[in-house]
Design a protein with these regions (language model features):
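Short, charged, solvent-exposed linker or helix-capping segments at domain edges/interfaces
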Residues: 94-99
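Short, cationic low-complexity segments
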Residues: 102-114
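Non-catalytic interaction-recognition regions
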Residues: 1-93, 111-588
């Protein structure tokens, strides 16, 4: 269906054309003076130079053709030549009826659906998720959901770090602690045990211990480097240990991502790309892209228009070892082979920008991707504490994601119990649902590229621009609809009618923005635009609620109209929070 703004622009364009002017001047925008009008057209200002005519004279000519408009209840000229507009209530009601009947609530399906891979999450195995992993998971998940909603085939890949020195460190520390394990017996030829020789908690303790030792003890570090090398060469005992590490770690990662309502289509790993490296490197050498510089194999990626130096992209170190750049390039080769995507989007810390500039340029220069394959980088800012520094525990350490979720849930549980709005037995589950909204909305309501302050007190508040406030609004609507049914009302009866007051019209106008907001949020990879939109819708609904007697309305047709408007508001808000990656409880 056509958006409200498109229909208004068509009406204005026709009026410009009838008045003898170019119809392209008929663009309509939301008014920057809502006290005077709802929308405005500045086309007469733009046309003044072309027609050598005062803008208010052009505007007068155009408005003369809007007197019998089926769209506008008001079209008036304000000097020096703005056209101020108000929409007819009947036209607005008809638009919302069509929107309610539309499966996608006015979102236009992508004309050319694309296959898009989103690389987000990106944790290293054998390490617990911490708050630094939060943004990639939350932002990537939301963009994936929005992309699917507008009609694209979007594939989410967690892309695990599983092939670096951390594996060698864990194997070395295990060998020091439990040398009797069969994995370290070179003469062993039997089947390796199915059960891992460690738990997730032991694994998470082993890595930092080994990492600390490697910084103090060079011999220990060399042993870990050798273990990494032997693993990558396919040593059977080490491969069996690697499988145990992967199984134990991935099971725990999935459990934690489930708590965040984040899911991945692919659980690909750095190691999956390793088989592609030799052929890729050889091809780059044969075609003359790769050359040896100070012992390392590199590809030049600088361009004439660069305003800062972009160093060569390193493929292999002087000892022949591969790097993150090598693995990322080989992963692109794998993705092109398996999925042939139109776009690959990486949702990672903005401090990795140089790395991805090098990788993208190298991939294009060497022909790893098609000319029209889009390689995108969404670099997010840092989540900071109230002191403006990266978020830490009270002791100054890196906070585990599990701990953050637990702290938020406890805060929400306390507030919900104080409100006494939910039975004790349901309070814990409700706190988890609302707690997730506090975390996700708190993050996503900020522009992804910017740093922000993670303020638990503010994010868990039921007032202001917060997740709990949005959920409270949805629960309020659910409560009214439930009462309506309990009183014998039929949720399917009636239709949205003209607004009876300004607050209702404002709510109706806000709802019309859904389609454009969602499409724009995907186009700009900007979930914060959906947050801003649902905050406006929630405020508009709550104003309408306080100013209007909904269930006590005596005119049955009018009451039914209110109910249909509430149903649409609920559907819009619930669709939006699903796109952001959380849901609403039945009570709060």
């Amino acid at each position: 269906m056509k958006k409200l703004m498109e229909q208004m622009a068509e009406e204005l364009s026709a009026a410009f054309e009838k008045a003898g002017y170019d119809p392209s001047y008929g663009k309509v925008t939301v008014s920057n003076r809502p006290d005077l009008c709802e929308f405005q057209c500045n086309g007469a200002m733009a046309g003044a130079k072309a027609y050598k005519k005062a803008p208010f004279m052009i505007a007068d000519d155009v408005v003369a053709y809007l007197k019998d408009s089926q769209v506008f209840s008001m079209a008036e000229v304000v000097k020096p030549g703005f056209i101020n507009l108000k929409v007819k209530g009947e036209f607005l009601a008809d638009y919302l009826k069509a929107m309610a009947a539309d499966e996608k609530l006015s979102v236009s399906a992508a004309k050319e659906p694309k296959t898009i891979i989103i690389d987000y999450g990106g944790p290293n195995v054998a390490k617990p998720l911490h708050v630094g992993h939060l943004r990639s998971a939350i932002i990537g998940e939301s963009i994936k959901r929005i992309g699917r909603f507008v009609g694209h085939k979007v594939i989410g890949d967690v892309h695990l770090g599983d092939w670096g020195l951390q594996m060698g460190l864990i194997i070395t520390e295990l060998k020091h602690r439990k040398p009797e394990l069969v994995y370290f017996d070179d003469s062993y030829t039997g089947e390796y045990p199915e059960e891992a020789p460690f738990t997730i908690s032991e694994l998470e303790e082993i890595y930092p211990c080994a990492s600390g030792k490697s910084k103090e003890d060079e011999a220990y570090r060399n042993e870990a480097l050798e273990a990494t090398h032997l693993l990558q060469q396919g040593k059977p005992g080490y491969m069996a240990l690697w499988n145990h590490i992967m199984n134990v770690s991935v099971t725990d990662l999935k459990r934690n991502y489930d708590k965040l309502n984040v899911s991945f289509d692919l659980w690909k790993k750095e190691s999956d790309a390793q088989p592609y490296i030799p052929g890729m490197v050889e091809d780059m050498k044969e075609k003359g892209f790769a050359y040896v510089d100070q012992g390392a194999l590199v590809v030049d990626v600088k361009e004439e228009n660069d305003t800062k130096e972009i160093p060569p992209c390193m493929l292999l170190k002087s000892d022949g070892a591969s790097l993150y750049t090598t693995t990322d390039l080989a992963t692109i080769v794998e993705r092109m082979k398996l999925f042939n995507p139109d776009e690959i989007l990486y949702v990672v810390d903005k401090r990795q920008e140089l790395h991805f500039i090098q990788v993208f340029r190298c991939a294009r220069k060497t022909g790893l991707v098609k000319d029209d394959t889009k390689l995108s980088f969404l670099g997010f800012g840092t989540m900071n504490g109230k002191d403006g520094k990266p978020f830490k525990t009270r002791e100054g350490g890196v906070m585990r994601l599990e701990t953050l979720i637990k702290d938020i849930n406890e805060e929400m549980f306390t507030k919900i119990v104080e409100n006494r709005s939910v039975k004790d037995k349901d309070a814990k589950e409700t706190a988890e649902i609302v707690g997730l909204s506090a975390i996700k909305y708190g993050d996503l309501s900020n522009q992804a590229t910017k740093d922000y302050i993670f303020d638990i007190d503010r994010f868990t508040s039921f007032e202001g621009n917060t997740g709990p406030y949005i959920l409270y609004t949805i629960v309020r609507i659910k409560s009214i609809l439930n009462r309506f049914v309990e009183e014998g009302g039929n949720l399917e009866a009636g239709a949205i009618l003209d607004p009876v007051n300004d607050s209702q019209k404002n709510l109706m106008l806000q709802l019309t923005g859904f389609g454009a907001t969602v499409e724009n949020a995907f186009e700009e990879k900007a979930p914060h635009k959906i947050c801003a939109y649902i905050y406006d819708v929630s405020n508009a609904f709550n104003s309408f609620y306080h100013e209007t007697k909904i269930l006590s309305e005596e005119n049955e047709a009018q009451k039914a109209s209110f109910i249909q408007l509430l149903k649409l508001t609920k559907k819009v808000l619930e669709t939006c929070i699903d796109l952001l990656g959380f849901s609403a409880p039945d009570r709060m």
